[in-house]
Amino acid sequence: MKKTVLLLLSCTALLQMKAQQYKGNWDAYVVQINHRPVSVVVDLDFGTSPKAKENQNVIIVQLNINNVQADGMPVRNEIKILDSIENGLVNNLSSVLNAQYTGRYTQNGRRDFYFYSNDTSDYKQHVKTVLQHFPAYTWTVLVSRDADLSNYLNVLYPTQKEMERIQNRRLVDALHTKGDQLTAARKVDHFLFFKTEADRKKFAGVVQDSGFVVENAGKEIGVKDRPYSLH
């Protein structure tokens, strides 16, 4: 009996340790929607992590920002308060609901915080426990089933174009960290695909006139949509 209890305790401790080890892969980006900025902070790895399967309910805390600039973003003096609210929500909801924080979305004077959790019991009270310390702010909280992660994928997660920008920025930051001043010329490979050989030939002529070098032009086997490649 004692061995069984010890084994259960060991398994519980191991699960808790694994849960604590997950830190995510965080980044931020800004896009323009209707000529106004949208600021997004997101855990890029959540959607493919075991956490996504374990937590299939989304909790969205919508907070109205009190002082905003003309573009709808918070003024500098309010950022520290917003950070305190964010930290409070993350600490409390992760503690009482084992909720996973996946990111925030800021636009037009409002900041939305996104959590995913398997447990949503008394969620509103848990949010209130934090926000009652910030009585100057108005807020609402929404909960819904979201097993397909539609809120995470459609609201927080970057498009392919934005993801490329994030990866490019990370590469530049890594080079800076290593002391690279980014002054030396570097070879950059571009791969493009076309529906017709004529389209490829036309494009190749334009880029060659601009100083680019075509290294290879081929045809992808088994590809129907855009089989003609250019490197």
Where are these regions (language model features)?
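Bacterial Sec-dependent N-terminal signal peptides
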Residues: 1-21
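Long, contiguous binding/interaction regions
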Residues: 20-231
